[in-house]
Amino acid sequence: MKFLLLVLAALGFLTQVIPASAGGSKCVSNTPGYCRTCCHWGETALFMCNASRKCCISYSFLPKPDLPQLIGNHWQSRRRNTQRKDKKQQTTVTS
């Protein structure tokens, strides 16, 4: 019984002394990421904190890329213009 009490006291003391490292430490002061050995779902590794830990940053904190215009819309607009030119040429030829 005394041994069980001693073990529980030791575990209670250790939980107060040892820091919880499940969340990881911050990468750099201005970076909204955490140093981890393996990134969670929805995160990507931006750079290495040290030899074995990556700086994992959530996708929501990353900038959104500027996407170019869709090629399909551009092609349709060119096609309409050529059809109009053909109609104009036919009307000028017949007049």
UniProtKB/Swiss-Prot annotation:
Residues 1-22 form the signal peptide. It comes from the Eukaryota. Residues 74-95 are annotated as: Disordered. GO terms for cellular component: extracellular space; sperm head. It is found in: Secreted. Residues 76-87 have a biased composition (Basic residues). Keywords: Antibiotic, Antimicrobial, Defensin, Disulfide bond, Secreted, Signal. GO terms for biological process: defense response to Gram-negative bacterium; innate immune response; killing of cells of another organism. InterPro entries: Beta-defensin, Beta_defensin_dom. Belongs to the beta-defensin family. Has antibacterial activity. PANTHER family: BETA-DEFENSIN 123, BETA-DEFENSIN 123-RELATED. This is Beta-defensin 132. It comes from Homo sapiens (Human). The gene is DEFB132.
